Amino acid sequence: MKRTFQPSNRKRRNKHGFRLRMSTKNGRRIINARRAKGRHSLSVSSDMGTAGR
């Protein structure tokens, strides 16, 4: 039987990436909350660099 989690960096970036977060009001709230908390990475795509493209 095939497992449910089939990892893909493209899907990961498109669903939880910085651009998607910034596109909605609640997404911006998440980014701001993570900034305030002092998170090392704000979103999935921010710590990927250009290697994931």
UniProtKB/Swiss-Prot annotation:
Keywords noted in UniProt: Ribonucleoprotein, Ribosomal protein
Leader sequence residues: none
Organism of origin: Chlorobium phaeovibrioides (strain DSM 265 / 1930)
The keyword Transferase is annotated on this UniProt entry: no
Annotated GO CC locations: ribonucleoprotein complex; ribosome
Matching PANTHER family: LARGE RIBOSOMAL SUBUNIT PROTEIN BL34M, MITOCHONDRIAL RIBOSOMAL PROTEIN 34 FAMILY MEMBER
InterPro entries membership: Ribosomal_bL34, Ribosomal_bL34_CS
Domain of life: Bacteria
HAMAP family, sorted: Ribosomal_bL34
Protein name per its UniProtKB record: Large ribosomal subunit protein bL34
Gene Ontology biological process: translation
A single MF term (Gene Ontology): structural constituent of ribosome
Taxonomic lineage of the native organism: Bacteria, Pseudomonadati, Chlorobiota, Chlorobiia, Chlorobiales
Biased composition (Basic residues): 1-19
Region feature (Disordered): 1-20
Entry similarity comment: Belongs to the bacterial ribosomal protein bL34 family.
Keyword NAD: no
